[in-house]
Amino acid sequence: PVEEKVRSELEKYPYSLEDLNKMYGNLRTLVSEADSSIAAIHSIQHEKDWFDNPIETTGQFSGVVIDARKEEVLILAPTEAIETADSLEVAFSDSAVLPGAVKQTDSRMGLTMIRVDATSLDDAQFEKIKPVKLGNSYGVRQGDLVISMGSPAGMVHSSSYGFISYIAKNVQMTDGNARVLYADIKSKADAGTFLFNTEGELVGWATDRYEQDVDTGMKTFMSISDYKGALELLSNGIQVPYLGIEGQEVTSEMEKNGMTSGIYMIAAAAESPAYNAGLQPGDILSGINDIKIEGMKNFQAQVEKLHVG
């Protein structure tokens, strides 16, 4: 594996203690800067004990700040943070704690956008809230050093280092394809873990959906670049369009054998719009709203332009 070759070459270099301290000092600085974009999500449940006394239970999750304006700070978090919550509180890295509310959710990808009104903060407090920089995950390469932030160790504001071990391109998923990054790094997807490059940019978020049955120690991350269009919709409170199709492009070879160009359907998710419209495996989706579908990227782009409802 590439990361083993990298380690082997590093081991050959006669690093001094000063070199190591400088290298790890730079990494600590990078982690500290990235951590300023991490927020703690307190998922609060209001319950009663055996004696009918009101009690509160709180779950802890990590989110990443996507945008910061005083009237609205937006935090991307896993849907687990809101599934059983009666109310939400958001604690920023400077310890400011404010009520949160769900702005929009994408259950297909397991993500939710939480909004916070920060007008009660003074300028000094607000300036400590740092929106994350979105990186280009298409530029991530096998062997790259990466950092997981959020809750990789199960606690908010924990972190871990590792290498990209493998990149799976064009992985089939509902309504398109995606790039999945595999890294030998700590990660806890349901608590909120986010992947950063060495520029301090967000390049992915943790998911359990594509982990292998055999425990290899590899953790999986969805590519942020594949999700930027949907991320903009969530930020504006718009529901991400959903058809519920799993399929593959009709190749030129398939066309030579008489198939129509478009997307060959492999499955339709139960109770999805595609399923309810009667689409089934073997059908070919050749267009959306009179626009010809010529490939998977084109299909994904057209789905994102649809309006829910």
Question: Locations of the language-model features?
Answer:
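PDZ/PDZ-like groove recognition
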Residues: 55-60, 189, 235-302
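N-terminal activation segment of mature serine protease catalytic domains
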Residues: 2-68, 74-75, 82-87, 141
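Active-site region of chymotrypsin-like
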Residues: 119-131, 160-217, 255, 259-267
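C-terminal cap/linker of serine protease catalytic domains
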Residues: 14-15, 26, 198, 202-258
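Active-site-proximal beta-strands of protease catalytic cores
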Residues: 38-40, 73-78, 139-152, 191-213, ...
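Beta-strand/loop subdomains of soluble extracytoplasmic proteins
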Residues: 84-102, 141-145, 157-170, 179, ...
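Catalytic-histidine neighborhood of serine endopeptidases
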Residues: 68-112, 116-119, 128
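Flexible, gly/ser-rich surface segments that form the specificity/activation loops bordering the active-site cleft
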Residues: 132-176, 211-214, 231-236
